[in-house]
Amino acid sequence: MISWGLSCLSVLGAAGTTLLCAGLLLGLAQQLWTLRWTLSRDWASTLPLPKGSMGWPFFGETLHWLVQGSRFHSSRRERYGTVFKTHLLGRPVIRVSGAENVRTILLGEHRLVRSQWPQSAHILLGSHTLLGAVGEPHRQRRKVLARVFSRSSLEQFVPRLQGALRREVRSWCAAQRPVAVYQAAKALTFRMAARILLGLQLDEARCTELAHTFEQLVENLFSLPLDVPFSGLRKGIRARDQLYEHLDEAVAEKLQEKQTAEPGDALLLIINSARELGHEPSVQELKELAVELLFAAFFTTASASTSLILLLLQHPAAITKIQQELSAQGLGRACTCTPRASGSPPDCGCEPDLSLAMLGRLRYVDCVVKEVLRLLPPVSGGYRTALRTFELDGYQIPKGWSVMYSIRDTHETAAVYRSPPEGFDPERFGVESGDARGSGGRFHYIPFGGGARSCLGQELAQAVLQLLAVELVRTARWELATPAFPVMQTVPIVHPVDGLLLFFHPLPTSGAGDGLPF
């Protein structure tokens, strides 16, 4: 018994020694990791590095970020201030928030900073995208893509988008079970982007399959840059290659077409614009640009659409005000005819519905959309790389370090609004409101970024949200299918953790046309 007890003590002692040594080694490794990045500062500058933690060797604070979500950034902002350092996704990062700090970053494009997304995003999206371009290539690609979102193109998109949204809302009302809104919104935005924006000919089964594949790609866009079996990057590459296989034929056909591109056909507009600038785009370039356009529309628009539906449900007074505005504009009653299979409005003889000009007159609807994007911006921020060492808020930003400006933190801490920033108040964007105006005011509200890299498709995105608000309010009422409102996850895209389960019910209507009533 004594020898057995001594053996147990010996084992426990050895285990304790091992754990102590392991702890000391881990602590030493962390200190050396921190020292490594401290020594990477620009010694020509007398300014200190921002406060913060670099986490653990190689992983940095990536795991904390993924687990804690928005709390990761808010807790560090409270501890270190509006400029702090961390280490995410394999790179040292300086996180920046606050209108003046963000203004410096956004207006410093090509001078202080250049666009920098995580390495995994560059690998998955390719080298021919607007996202990855810098300098003159960026300006040229932006000029080409600008035609896709021109006024004439948007005019062509609006009636087709409205038809698709009307069909979707009616399908939700017809469902005899709860609708998972976030999943439905992702499927809807992919269909609209693929069929309406890119003009791809997809049946429902193929569209559903590609939407799932695309979701796999985007879900692994922000992953560790390790191309090994079962890694997120490997899954993303496999999904991307499957998308490219489908796009090969569609892109090749577009390249062979000789007619002038009409507004509303994104791929043909891109091809013709590039040719006018003396460049013949390759199949690979067009595939990458097509995937980038899908990426720009997919999760972000689905996220904002879900947030719109959730916030309207939580604030019924806003629904009442929208209904009053629609009635005042003669738009209070929706056409009850069945839209065409393509998503375009029905050929029913009803009075023409919404246009860009009509949307422009819906001031309160516009305020609601802006407030949704302020309170729950789909994307938390944007990445840049410092081209040279510069000062920001009393700290040095060393050349070569990544900078991430925070949209969400900037919105949450903006002190320019009359009403509290954490509340839902569309009136803050009203005509009579002076909120967010004055010196630097536009950088208190940045859901679409700003400067040379502001979102080209912001008018299209806002039009989609306005159309969705109109179709919802005059077609349906909705209620929770769960006991309580869901928790919102904010990394990497804002969305409800349970997908937002809702029941939709059609509003009473009178026949408005020759087609079948809903």
UniProtKB/Swiss-Prot annotation:
Listed GO MF terms = heme binding; iron ion binding; retinoic acid 4-hydroxylase activity; retinoic acid binding
* Membrane topology per record: Single-pass membrane protein
Q: Which domain of life is it from?
A: Eukaryota
What Pfam families would the database entry show?
p450
The record's subcellular location field reads: Membrane
**Which UniProt keywords are listed?**
Heme, Iron, Lipid metabolism, Membrane, Metal-binding, Monooxygenase, Oxidoreductase, Transmembrane, Transmembrane helix
Q: Which residues form a coiled coil?
A: none
List the transmembrane segments.
Answer: 293-313
Q: Taking the first listed entry, what is the main subcellular location of this protein, grouped into a coarse class?
A: membrane
Disulfide-bonded cysteines: none
InterPro entries in the record: Cyt_P450, Cyt_P450_CS, Cyt_P450_E_grp-I, Cyt_P450_sf
Q: Which cofactor does it need?
A: heme
Q: What happens when the gene is disrupted?
A: The knockout presents no discernible embryological defects, however double homozygous mutants for Cyp26a1/c1 display a more severe RA embryopathy phenotype than either mutant alone, with lethality by E11.0. Among others, this includes CNS patterning abnormalities, a reduced size of the head, eye, frontonasal region and an open neural tube between the fore and hindbrain.
What this protein catalyses is: an organic molecule + reduced [NADPH--hemoprotein reductase] + O2 = an alcohol + oxidized [NADPH--hemoprotein reductase] + H2O + H(+); all-trans-retinoate + reduced [NADPH--hemoprotein reductase] + O2 = all-trans-4-hydroxyretinoate + oxidized [NADPH--hemoprotein reductase] + H2O + H(+); all-trans-4-hydroxyretinoate + reduced [NADPH--hemoprotein reductase] + O2 = all-trans-4-oxoretinoate + oxidized [NADPH--hemoprotein reductase] + 2 H2O + H(+); 9-cis-retinoate + reduced [NADPH--hemoprotein reductase] + O2 = 9-cis-4-hydroxyretinoate + oxidized [NADPH--hemoprotein reductase] + H2O + H(+)
Q: Where does heme bind?
A: C455
One BP annotation, GO:
neural crest cell development
UniProt EC number = 1.14.14.1
Enzyme class at the top of the EC tree: oxidoreductase
What are the annotated GO cellular component locations?
membrane
The family line of this record is: Belongs to the cytochrome P450 family.
The free-text function statement in the UniProt record for this protein reads:
A cytochrome P450 monooxygenase involved in the metabolism of retinoates (RAs), the active metabolites of vitamin A, and critical signaling molecules in animals. RAs exist as at least four different isomers: all-trans-RA (atRA), 9-cis-RA, 13-cis-RA, and 9,13-dicis-RA, where atRA is considered to be the biologically active isomer, although 9-cis-RA and 13-cis-RA also have activity.
Q: What is this protein called?
A: Cytochrome P450 26C1
Taxonomic source organism: Mus musculus
